[in-house]
C-alpha cells in the first residue's frame, strides 16, 4: 500500500501529464528511477524530449514548489536525464531536450508551467 504522500504525488503527476497532453505534448515515460534521482515525467514536444519535474506545496511555509527545486535537485534531475538518455543510446549533447517544471499549489487547479526551467 502506498503512503498518503505517495498517492498524492502520483495524483499530481497524473494531472501534470493530462495538462501537458492537453497542450500537445506526447507521453513517453513516468517515474524513471536511478541511483541519483527520479524523472517524474518524460514527454515529447514535437522533436524535443521534455524532462518534467512535478512539485507540489500546500503552503509556502518551507518555500514555494518552485523554490523547492534547489541546485541539488537540479543536479539530480540532469544526472537522471543523462542516465535515461544513455539507456536509449543517446546523450544530452546529441539530443534536443529541455527541462520543464510543473509546480502545483494546494490543488490540481493551482498550476504553474515553467518551460526551460533549467535554461
Swiss-Prot record:
State the superkingdom. Answer: Bacteria
| Gene3D superfamilies (alphabetical) | 3.40.1350.10
Pfam families per the UniProt record, alphabetical: UPF0102
Show the GO MF annotations.
Answer: nucleic acid binding
Q: Which SUPFAM superfamilies match?
A: Restriction endonuclease-like (SSF52980)
Q: What family is this?
A: Belongs to the UPF0102 family.
Instruction: Please identify the protein, giving its name as recorded.
Output: UPF0102 protein PM0647
**From which organism does this entry originate?**
Pasteurella multocida (strain Pm70)
Amino acid at each position: 500500500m502506498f503512503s498518503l504522500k505517495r498517492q498524492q504525488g502520483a495524483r499530481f503527476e497524473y494531472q501534470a501529464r493530462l495538462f501537458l497532453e492537453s497542450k500537445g505534448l506526447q507521453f513517453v515515460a513516468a517515474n524513471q528511477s536511478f541511483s541519483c534521482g527520479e524523472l517524474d515525467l518524460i514527454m515529447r514536444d514535437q522533436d524535443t524530449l521534455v524532462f518534467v519535474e512535478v512539485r507540489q506545496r500546500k503552503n509556502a511555509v518551507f518555500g514555494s514548489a518552485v523554490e523547492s527545486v534547489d541546485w541539488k535537485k537540479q543536479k539530480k534531475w540532469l544526472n537522471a536525464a543523462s542516465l535515461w538518455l544513455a539507456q536509449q543510446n543517446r546523450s544530452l549533447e546529441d539530443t534536443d531536450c529541455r527541462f520543464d517544471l510543473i509546480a502545483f499549489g494546494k490543488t490540481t487547479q493551482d498550476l504553474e508551467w515553467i518551460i526551460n526551467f533549467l535554461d
